[in-house]
């Protein structure tokens, strides 16, 4: 997934589709995996992935490096704060934040 400079974002959410799919498969819990492919401070300056725990926003990308795999519960509230929202958006840019994600989904 690409979150481009100029405001690429993902609103805070829980992975409802993964939660529903896990229930259909009679799983109580499912974990998502996310591979970080860019580095905050190098590939983009502001924004990035976060989780919300105990009503506090945690910027996990302050601590993470390129190649790190994050594993989190599908029920965790998470998202992406605007990537370099001080820059004018350019939908053709390849610059910004990149991740690869694996989730559970079943029709």
Where are each of the predicted segments found?
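Conserved double-stranded beta-helix
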Residues: 1-41, 101
């Amino acid at each position: 997934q690409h979150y481009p400079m100029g405001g690429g974002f993902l609103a805070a959410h829980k992975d409802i589709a993964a939660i529903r799919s896990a229930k259909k498969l009679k799983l109580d819990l499912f974990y998502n995996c996310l591979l970080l492919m860019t580095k905050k401070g190098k590939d983009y300056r502001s924004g990035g992935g976060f989780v919300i725990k105990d009503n506090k926003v945690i910027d996990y990308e302050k601590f993470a490096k390129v190649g790190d795999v994050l594993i989190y519960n599908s029920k965790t509230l998470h998202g992406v704060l605007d990537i370099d929202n001080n820059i004018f958006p350019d939908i053709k840019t390849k610059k910004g934040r990149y991740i690869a994600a694996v989730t559970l989904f079943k029709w």
